[in-house]
UniProtKB/Swiss-Prot annotation:
It comes from Pelotomaculum thermopropionicum (strain DSM 13744 / JCM 10971 / SI). One of its GO terms (molecular function) is metal ion binding. [4Fe-4S] cluster 2 binds at residues 158, 162, 165. [4Fe-4S] cluster 1 binds at residues 11, 47, 81. Its cofactor is [4Fe-4S] cluster. This is tRNA-2-methylthio-N(6)-dimethylallyladenosine synthase. Residues 377-440 form the TRAM domain. Binds 2 [4Fe-4S] clusters. One cluster is coordinated with 3 cysteines and an exchangeable S-adenosyl-L-methionine.
Amino acid sequence: MKKYRIIVFGCQMNEHDSEVLAGILESMGYCQAGNSEDPDIILINTCCVRKTAENKVFSLLGRLRRQKAQNPNLIIGVCGCMPQQEGMAERIKQLFPHVDLIFGTHNVHQLPELIGKVIEGQKQVLEIWPGYGGELREELPVKRKEGVRAWVTIMYGCNNFCTYCIVPYVRGREKSRSPEAVYEEVARLAGEGFKEVILLGQNVNSYGKDLGVKTDFASLLESLENIDGIDRIRYMTSHPRDFSLRLVEAIAASKKVCEHFHLPVQAGSNRILKKMNRGYTREEYVDLIRYIKSLIPHATVTTDIMVGFPGETDEDFNDTLDLVREIRFDSAYTFVYNIRPGTPAAEMPDQVAENVKKERIQALIKLQNKISLERNEEEVGQTQEVLVEGEKDRGSGFIYGRNRGNKTVIFSGDPSLVGKVVPVTVTGARLAHLTGILSYNYHQEGSR
């Protein structure tokens, strides 16, 4: 049997797209190659949000040159967001003639046809669709990893056009799946034994706007609440501008939607937020967080923060630090701005010097790490619901899972608890996780 290997860069959307690629390949008779096995086909699912990810892809393609020379029948494919960028597919063809297949984000369903062309002898098969205006394809197979959590894409694309972001150009405009299709998939996952679903989209808060029917993200969450077997519902990613008060209220009323709000703020300076085209002010963001906390005092709030956006001054950066102190995020994904060709920010004057970016990111990380540890320490003594996901290390006697705030909790327990929601009393706090003990009043036969 022929074997495949998929190498993934980037976000959860790419991870789930790779599950679809795997499903298609297995429907064609391929099986996944083990770590020590040589595959017959390698697909590299790429990301272009950061230059770092692109550099890693180029480095990998360079290393695969030797493997291709040793096995000329090996099929090497590049897919995902990178080839969707203007001129990138041709660049890959020229730099890496050993790449057999290049396709984008809109035509994954063509994979069998494209592989067939390679097998027939066509060189460097290229198929990039600049956009996709047709119906979403619901029939594609999915090969999910075993576990208790499953990703479910509810929409594709983004209409926001933040000035630094390449996503709308490579993922296209927003297009929502029907609520019926989402409901059916989640119900099927419940029947397969999954306990948690993570709803995916570049901006889930815009769900339904393009459907022409009276539905929105809050309504979708309310409908999924009724599916037996699913204990938890999460979602990503959200845009603060589109996060409605009704959505906050729906989450507060839900028993299954987790109280974790990931709301990328990006900057604390109104001047920079405007240049980024984020569509909200610092004050509006703070008001949203306050409303969330007023309804859900124990909510976990996390964020993304960028430093070094073009024109960012010391005063602008200090505004960001002040916001971090004010909100006290549970955690933050912090990163340095880098130029994405084709975006408005790439052409902006006053690009910030690299040494200044480095100083600022270090100061931000130091502050946020201090706050993150303090926020975790505040949870010591609490008894929390933890969905057990697996063993920490095989035979170690420790298992791990996530609480409703999406924080990892490590505690002593039997692997038979995987897939169950159990009460854990938090006894310790680290920067990246909590430690605890299984609550004394837990009875295995009563667990969910």
